[in-house]
C-alpha cells in the first residue's frame, strides 16, 4: 500500500467512525423516545439492585456481548455474575458461559453494570468481549485466547495475561492496558488515545489508526524487533524519531508497527 493510499485509508476510517456514531446516536434516540412513549417506565434499569448468580466453577469459555452496560471483571472467590440491568441475559452451556444484553439502548443514561467475578487462580481457555457504548474495567484476567471488540466507551485493563494469542479491535474511546503479559498480539487501535504497558511476546501486529498511541514494552530493547511503516503519522522509539520502513532491534519478539494518522511513542521499560 502506497503512502497516499494509507492517508486515504485512515482519513476514511475517521470519517466512517464519525458518520456511524452520528447515525447510531440518532437512531438510538428515536427508538428510546418511541419506547418510552409506548412502554412508560419499562426501559428503566433497576438501580442499586444487584442480582447475584453463582456459576459452576468448570467454566473455561466466557462470551460477553452487550450494547450499553458497563463491564467490570473482578477477582472473586468463585465464578459469579452481578448485574442491575434487567435486560441482561445469561446462560451456561457446558463449559461455556454466555452473556448478552437483550435490549439495544446504546445510550442508556442509567449506567447499568455487569460484574463478572473470576477466581484469581483461574485461567480461561477463551474470552470474547463485544462492547458497545459502555465502559470496560478489568482488575485481572488470565486467558489462553482473547478476542476484544471495543466500542465507544473507555477501557481500563490491568493484569492481563494472554498465553496463546490476543486480538483487540479498538473503538472510539480511550483504552489503557497495563501490567500485562501478552503473546502474539493482533491490535487495531481504532480512533482515540491508546496506551499499553506490557511484555509483548512472539509475533505481533499493531495497526495504529487515528490519534495518539503510547506503547511501553516491558523488558530489554534487545528482546524486541520492531518493523515500522508509517503514513502521515510520526513514530518515536526510546526518544528517537523513526523513518518509514525502518527496523529497530533484532530480538526474538517481533512487532510489525503500522502508524496511521497521529503519533506513536514506543518506550522500553527495563
Mark where each language-model region is:
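Short amphipathic alpha-helical "recognition" segments used for binding
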Residues: 7-13, 96, 143, 182, ...
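Short, surface-exposed interaction patches in beta-rich subdomains
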Residues: 157-160, 164-170, 174-270
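N-terminal Lys/Arg-rich, disordered targeting/topogenic segments
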Residues: 1-7
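Short linear S-[DN]-x-LW-Φ motif typified by the pepsin-like aspartic protease active-site region
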Residues: 29-130, 135-147, 156, 215-219, ...
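Hydrophobic membrane-insertion alpha-helices, especially the h-region
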Residues: 10-28
Amino acid at each position: 500500500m502506497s503512502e497516499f493510499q494509507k492517508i486515504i485509508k485512515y482519513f476514511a476510517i475517521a470519517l466512517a467512525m464519525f458518520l456511524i456514531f452520528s447515525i447510531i446516536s440518532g437512531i438510538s434516540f428515536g427508538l428510546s423516545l418511541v419506547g418510552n412513549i409506548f412502554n412508560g417506565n419499562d426501559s428503566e434499569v433497576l438501580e442499586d439492585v444487584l442480582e447475584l448468580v453463582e456459576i459452576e466453577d468448570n467454566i473455561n469459555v466466557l462470551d460477553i456481548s452487550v450494547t450499553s452496560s458497563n463491564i467490570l471483571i473482578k477477582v472473586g472467590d468463585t465464578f459469579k455474575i452481578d448485574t442491575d440491568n434487567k435486560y441482561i441475559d445469561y446462560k451456561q452451556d457446558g463449559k461455556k458461559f454466555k452473556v448478552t444484553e437483550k435490549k439495544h439502548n446504546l445510550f442508556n443514561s442509567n449506567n447499568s453494570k455487569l460484574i463478572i467475578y473470576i477466581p484469581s487462580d483461574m485461567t480461561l481457555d477463551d474470552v470474547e468481549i463485544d462492547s458497545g457504548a459502555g465502559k470496560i474495567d478489568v482488575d485481572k484476567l488470565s486467558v489462553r485466547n482473547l478476542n476484544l471488540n471495543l466500542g465507544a466507551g473507555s477501557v481500563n485493563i490491568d493484569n492481563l495475561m494472554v498465553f496463546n494469542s490476543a486480538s483487540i479491535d479498538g473503538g472510539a474511546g480511550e483504552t489503557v492496558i497495563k501490567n500485562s503479559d501478552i503473546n502474539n498480539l493482533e491490535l487495531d487501535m481504532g480512533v482515540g488515545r491508546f496506551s499499553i504497558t506490557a511484555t509483548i511476546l512472539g509475533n505481533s501486529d499493531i495497526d495504529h489508526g487515528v490519534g495518539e498511541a503510547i506503547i511501553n514494552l516491558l523488558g530489554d530493547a534487545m528482546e524486541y524487533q520492531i518493523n515500522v511503516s508509517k503514513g502521515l503519522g510520526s513514530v518515536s522509539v526510546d526518544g528517537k524519531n523513526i523513518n518509514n520502513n525502518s527496523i529497530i532491534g533484532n530480538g526474538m519478539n517481533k512487532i510489525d508497527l503500522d502508524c496511521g494518522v497521529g503519533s506513536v511513542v514506543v518506550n522500553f521499560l527495563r
